[in-house]
């Protein structure tokens, strides 16, 4: 954790890592083609165990989520992809709307993944969850004054909040969750208030928001948990 920065972790789990089977043609050839936006060693370990247990080789195609989804659209029915592995339910919604996914029936998936973490039509399933949280300077912010996203709209935080652009999928998913929880009108009012409270124009990555707090540019930031530590 960045020294001098505290974190609110009990807000809401919103950034889901998701996977969905696209086809089965490669399985017949003892090869599984995975289009992956992820870059974690844990995935490599999982893939190796799968190959050791089944004898099926895994071919991983790397790229950003948007690039991979666009590739699936371009390839159409001729796509060699079997699985799309990416982050955030918002991106999986885009993939579903683009028509590049198909439903899967699996008792194992149904048994291990709750309905709240999978598509209603079983076109994608959540593997892990992470939180989009509020971080703040322990020296400049009293934790008793800040415990929810709604608190960020208070005018006392004017000129003190750092956040990346609203064009980022993580913030779009956050906004979607607030619309679901509070309604569109209240969520829009909240967003306008937070904008007025920004310490600077939105820029950079989640890590840049944490750096802004650590350097004193801002007192509060919104970011994903896995960037902390």
Language model features with spans:
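Extracytoplasmic ligand-binding site segments that recognize negatively charged/polar headgroups
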Residues: 37, 41, 63, 80-218
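Cleavable N-terminal signal peptides
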Residues: 18, 27-28
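Bacterial N-terminal signal peptides that target proteins for export
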Residues: 2-16
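Early extracytoplasmic/lumenal segment of secretory-pathway proteins
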Residues: 30-93
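C-terminal lobe and pocket-closing loops
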Residues: 216-229
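Short, hydrophobic alpha-helical packing/hinge segments within bilobed ligand-binding/sensory domains
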Residues: 68-69, 92, 209-210, 227-228
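Short amphipathic alpha-helical coupling segments at ligand-binding clamshell hinges
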Residues: 46, 189-190, 224
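N-terminal signal peptide c-region/cleavage motif recognized by signal peptidases
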Residues: 23-25
């Amino acid at each position: 954790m960045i020294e001098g920065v505290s974190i609110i972790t009990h807000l809401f789990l919103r950034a889901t890592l998701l996977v969905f089977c696209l086809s089965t043609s490669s399985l017949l050839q003892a090869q599984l083609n995975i289009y992956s936006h992820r870059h974690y060693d844990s995935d490599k370990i999982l893939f190796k165990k799968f190959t050791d247990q089944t004898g099926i080789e895994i071919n991983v195609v790397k790229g950003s989520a948007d690039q991979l989804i666009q590739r699936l659209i371009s390839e159409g029915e001729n796509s060699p992809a079997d699985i799309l592995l990416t982050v955030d339910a918002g991106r999986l919604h885009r993939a579903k709307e683009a028509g590049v996914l198909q439903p899967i029936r699996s008792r194992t998936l149904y048994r291990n993944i709750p309905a709240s973490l999978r598509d209603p039509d079983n076109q994608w399933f959540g593997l892990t969850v992470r939180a989009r949280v509020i971080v703040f300077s322990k020296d400049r912010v009293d934790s008793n004054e800040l415990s929810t996203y709604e608190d960020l709209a208070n005018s006392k935080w004017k000129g003190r909040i750092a956040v990346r652009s609203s064009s980022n999928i993580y913030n779009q998913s956050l906004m979607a969750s607030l619309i679901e929880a509070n309604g569109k009108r209240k969520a829009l009012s909240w967003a306008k208030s937070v904008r007025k409270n920004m310490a600077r124009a939105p820029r950079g990555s989640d890590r840049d928001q944490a750096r802004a707090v650590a350097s004193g540019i801002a007192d509060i930031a919104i970011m994903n948990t896995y960037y902390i530590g």
